[in-house]
Amino acid sequence: VSPALIGHSVLRQLGLLPRTLVVDLGCAVAPATVHLRLPPPEAVGPAACLSSGAAMGRQRVLALLERGRRWGRQWPKNEPLLLAECVPGGTSTALAVLLGLGLAAEGLVSGSLLQPAHGLKSRLARQGLAAACLEIDARGVDPLAVLAAVGDPMQALAAGLTWEASARGVPVLLAGGSQMAAVLALALALAPADQRQQLASQAVVATTAWLAEEPHSDLAELLALISQRWRVRAQLTVASLRFDHCRSQALRDYERGYVKEGVGAGGFALLWELSGRPAAELAALCDADCERLLNSPWLGGA
């Protein structure tokens, strides 16, 4: 069962669904929900394969970045912002961007498989960076060039939004794992040096215990590298949600590593806790919602 279940359960129970914005950045099939489709050149289909070294045109990157910055400047200072993503192949673009920004991130980035395909991700990332004539572990690289070469549209939009909102003092919850670490790294690389401390103090990566405890990746070490690279204190927080006592096998499989994070699961679970509700109550709610979903006529249930 998709981790989107967690976000849906939280948003519905907390009455936040009307305040949720889904942004389509170029899906071949439009989301089956109310959403905002950005105009060209921001949304002109998916990015090309990162191995090409030409994932997006620079014009598209600049347009997405400026859109994010504009939204960040317009966001109310007294309203926290939660950013989530759903990007196919997103951990691969995350690794490629992190490498392009000069971080030794190989082996640290997670993935959707039970055991992340570190070798495959590294080969694709290195191939793309080489094709774009970008050095791995280089310092002083142009983050826009890295984004255009091996990034994805979400990263450009989210980095601009994180940069401007955080710099203005808006609390930003980067709901996710490796992909949101890459967004934070991009925001820090793009921001002027005198804004980075403020940015890092306001933007927090929020993930699940399943990802944080995964033996085949290391998000905490990834954040430590980001802290060292830009001389800030990158923040990571882990939600308490566990599914070990759920009735649904589909949810208990999270505890076995088959699902770890995605669609903002960790951030939404943390939002639930910040509202003063216990994590066990959210687990029970997800269990009931999962049972309803699996028994729905859409899936051939009763």
Over which residues does each language-model region extend?
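N-terminal loops that bind phosphate or other acidic moieties
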Residues: 1-84, 88-302
